[in-house]
């Protein structure tokens, strides 16, 4: 996937002939979709043109099917923004856990663009596309979100020159994190310094119950120029190489 144009193997396995055929097939499928975890993520957002919500979702689902048929090995997540003052019902699509090399080598770019022009572009406005770096020293998790049905999504824009102090302050609080909490720093694609925090959770109740405990430390308040907190709904029918967690 690309912005304005959605673009949305593992280790060798030696298998003895004594293994059942179905087991061999399972191993082969896992090897095809497994990726080494790197620090980079691509996060983008689009919204439906007025009156095109149904058409956009149908076209986007068709486009994701193109990725499957092309045997794309990227893991593609899709979320709908649920609680937001500005972006309700917008679609966030993202892929996580990449090395620089893997993110630079998407599947069949020309064919991807062609299918996107046919199925998605007539119904969508693209409103953001960035490459982010996962910050393990600020986080709890490995940078590839658990595909839970809900997530809290926080975007933070800082005053110029405040990035280092912000990261030092958050690193000092890392041990207090409750549950999966993933911080990413924007590398390219918008105003910097800016950050995204993603907190995957099974339910809205889990997000709300932890809200007070997950507030940013007071010492960073003067560093922030803008902060937005939204909640997302995972779209199980808009995933590639991602299996959503069962509802609880």
Language model feature labels by segment:
Residues 25-248:
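Short S/T/G/P-rich N-terminal loop/turn motif that feeds into the first structured element of a domain
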Residues 1-7:
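N-terminal secretory signal peptides that target proteins for export/translocation
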Residues 11-25:
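Bacterial N-terminal signal peptides
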């Amino acid at each position: 996937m690309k912005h304005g144009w959605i673009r949305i193997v593992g280790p060798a396995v030696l298998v003895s002939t004594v293994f059942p055929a179905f087991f061999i097939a399972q191993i082969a499928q896992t090897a095809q979709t497994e990726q080494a975890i790197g620090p980079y993520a691509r996060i983008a957002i689009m919204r439906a043109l007025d009156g095109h919500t149904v058409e956009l979702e149908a076209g986007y689902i068709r486009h994701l099917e193109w990725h499957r048929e092309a045997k794309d090995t990227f893991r593609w997540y899709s979320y709908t923004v649920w609680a937001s003052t500005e972006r309700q019902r917008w679609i966030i699509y993202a892929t996580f856990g990449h090395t620089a090399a893997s993110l630079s080598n998407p599947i069949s770019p020309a064919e991807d663009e062609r299918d996107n022009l046919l199925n998605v572009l007539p119904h969508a406005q693209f409103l953001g596309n960035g490459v982010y770096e996962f910050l393990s020293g600020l986080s709890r998790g490995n940078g590839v979100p658990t595909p839970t049905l809900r997530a809290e999504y926080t975007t933070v824009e800082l005053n110029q020159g405040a990035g280092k102090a912000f990261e030092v302050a958050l690193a000092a609080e890392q041990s207090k994190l409750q549950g999966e909490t993933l911080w990413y720093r924007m590398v390219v694609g918008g105003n910097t310094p800016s950050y995204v925090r993603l907190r995957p959770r099974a339910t809205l109740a889990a997000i709300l119950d932890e809200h007070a405990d997950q507030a940013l430390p007071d010492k960073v308040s003067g560093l922030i120029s803008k902060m937005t907190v939204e909640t997302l709904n995972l779209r199980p029918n808009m995933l590639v190489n991602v299996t959503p967690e069962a509802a609880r």
